[in-house]
């Protein structure tokens, strides 16, 4: 009896037109352009109808057009030839987000592009980062969200004190943290790529570190809490989880007591300094835990708004937030000669000289002997 049916033909490699079609579509969306917008940016060299045909894989471009497209879309030419990979699963954007469709698509395309480069870098180094879910039960109530934060801290052995570097903490535990330039209305989103949990954060959050920390943990909530898709309080549950991760209940009681009639702003400023949580989130936490009466919370919130603190809060948090894993892997791949400097620049999606400067790498002319001289 023949067993020939057990041998599978290798999957056909996608042809250039198909790869180019996907990559052009991705690069256009990442640039925040419609087909007509790209046609205009190309000064009418190519019509939007022709661009549509390229994106459908019906036509292949010549080298002149490739170079022009790369320039207009601010991406290296070889990005159009990069092998296709699985797409990010359903990306969880904030419900009721006021993000325009074009800006949302741009954020998705940039995230997809970045995570593909990240995974390619890991594969070059033969690394498979282990991620295991820190909790394994559905979250249905605010009490569940508090418990979940407690359990995540316990499973990840984080103790009860302030979390020093949230982004590094997530990366050390197998969560890919991706930073993208995005619309000011976009803070973050989360998704899965195969078994890889991915958190995407806007680079404008660097101007507000407590908000960056809170957003990262809010997105972790979407990944680990197992909230039903149609749960009406999904966003609030993730908020509660993030606040409990930053400032655990026991620490709140220890710092400010279990019952208060009022709280002074300097008290919250010192909490912000220690725990890296914003005044707004700390105040909300006191309401959540029923430490402050609802009426007092509302009065303090009015004060907060009147002072203009929703635009610029008093108090600062000096802790550092940096997800350095991608750059560390890039330097490791360079040191082990797994990649050339130009490949590193393509993976980092930045010009070669900019990468050389950012990572403080020696220039092409420098040699060990030159470096050794005083």
Residue ranges and their predicted role:
Residues 1-374:
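Active-site hotspot residues in diverse enzymes, especially metal/ion-binding acidic/histidine motifs
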């Amino acid at each position: 009896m023949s067993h020939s049916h057990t041998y599978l033909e290798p999957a056909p490699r996608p042809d250039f037109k198909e790869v180019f079609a996907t990559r052009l579509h991705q690069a256009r969306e990442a640039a925040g352009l419609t087909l007509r917008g790209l046609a205009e940016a190309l000064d009418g060299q190519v019509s939007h109808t022709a661009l549509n045909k390229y994106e459908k894989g019906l036509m292949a471009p010549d080298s002149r057009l490739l170079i022009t497209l790369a320039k207009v879309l601010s991406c290296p030419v070889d990005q159009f030839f990069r092998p296709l990979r699985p797409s990010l699963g359903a990306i969880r954007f904030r419900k009721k987000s006021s993000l325009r469709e074009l800006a949302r698509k741009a954020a998705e395309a940039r995230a997809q592009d970045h995570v593909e480069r990240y995974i390619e870098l890991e594969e070059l180094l033969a690394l498979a980062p282990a991620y295991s879910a820190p909790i394994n039960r559905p979250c249905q109530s605010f009490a569940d969200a508090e418990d979940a934060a407690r359990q995540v801290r316990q499973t990840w052995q984080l103790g009860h004190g302030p979390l020093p570097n949230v982004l590094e903490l997530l990366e050390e535990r197998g969560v890919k943290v991706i930073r993208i330039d995005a619309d000011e209305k976009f803070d973050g989103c989360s998704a899965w790529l195969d078994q890889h949990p991915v958190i995407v954060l806007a680079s404008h959050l660097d101007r507000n570190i407590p908000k960056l920390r809170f957003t990262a943990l809010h997105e972790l909530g979407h990944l680990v809490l197992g909230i039903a898709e149609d749960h009406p309080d999904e966003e609030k549950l993730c908020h509660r989880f993030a606040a409990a991760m930053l400032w655990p209940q026991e620490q709140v009681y220890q710092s400010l007591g279990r019952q208060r009639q009022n709280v002074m702003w300097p008290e919250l400023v010192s909490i912000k300094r220690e725990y890296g949580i914003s005044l707004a989130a700390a105040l909300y936490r006191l309401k959540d835990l029923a430490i402050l009466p609802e009426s007092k919370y509302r009065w303090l919130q009015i004060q907060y708004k009147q002072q203009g603190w929703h635009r610029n809060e008093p108090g600062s948090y000096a802790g550092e937030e940096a997800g350095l894993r991608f750059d560390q892997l890039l330097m490791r791949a360079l040191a082990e000669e797994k990649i050339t400097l130009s490949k590193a620049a393509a993976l980092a999606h930045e010009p070669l000289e900019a990468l050389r400067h950012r990572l403080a790498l020696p220039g092409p002319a420098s040699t060990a002997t030159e470096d050794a001289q005083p």
